[in-house]
């Protein structure tokens, strides 16, 4: 459990060295979820940890999955206004037409013009 907590902290805080060390020691960490079915890509997108997010995706982490609320990593990044995370997820092929729990698409939910441009 402590290993998962350390990994989660490293992902959220952009500690790429410890993220890599953890994944190299235990690859299945890229597939863990919390009590709301949020995984590492959700956390990285939510905190705009683009380097971590790119690494996780390169190791096979799911980045189009929904949590218990119907939120994908892309929606998490859009809701937080994190252009870098949105740009990476779109580049990697995230579903741009996903609809969030509020009934809005990622494009409709975006408040920043640069994010809207990425989602067109």
Curated annotation (Swiss-Prot):
Gene Ontology CC: one annotated term: cytoplasm
Keyword tRNA-binding annotated: no
Record flagged with keyword Repeat: yes
One MF term in the entry's GO annotations: protein-containing complex binding
Cellular compartment(s): Cytoplasm; Nucleus
Chief location bin: cytoplasm
Domain of life: Eukaryota
InterPro entries, per the entry: Ankyrin_rpt (IPR002110), Ankyrin_rpt-contain_sf (IPR036770)
Transmembrane segments: none
UniProt keyword annotations, A-Z: ANK repeat, Cytoplasm, Nucleus, Repeat
GO BP annotations listed: actin cytoskeleton organization; negative regulation of barbed-end actin filament capping; regulation of barbed-end actin filament capping
ANK repeat ranges per the UniProt record: 1-31, 36-65, 69-98
Family: Belongs to the myotrophin family.
UniProt-listed PANTHER family: ANKYRIN REPEAT DOMAIN-CONTAINING PROTEIN 39-RELATED (PTHR24171), BRCA1-ASSOCIATED RING DOMAIN PROTEIN 1 (PTHR24171:SF8)
Function recorded in the entry: May regulate NF-kappa-B transcription factor activity. Plays a role in the regulation of the growth of actin filaments. Inhibits the activity of the F-actin-capping protein complex.
Name of the featured protein: Myotrophin homolog
The organism of origin for this protein: Dictyostelium discoideum
């Amino acid at each position: 459990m402590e290993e998962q907590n350390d990994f989660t902290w490293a992902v959220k805080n952009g500690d790429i060295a410890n993220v890599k060390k953890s994944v190299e020691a235990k690859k299945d960490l890229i597939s863990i979820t919390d009590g709301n079915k949020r995984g590492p890509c959700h956390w990285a997108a939510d905190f705009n940890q683009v380097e971590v997010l790119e690494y996780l995706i390169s190791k096979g982490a799911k980045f189009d999955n929904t949590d218990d609320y119907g939120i994908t990593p892309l929606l998490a990044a859009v809701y937080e206004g994190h252009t870098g995370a949105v740009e990476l997820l779109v580049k990697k092929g995230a579903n741009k037409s996903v609809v969030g729990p509020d009934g809005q698409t990622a494009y409709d939910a975006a408040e920043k013009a640069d994010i809207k441009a990425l989602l067109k």
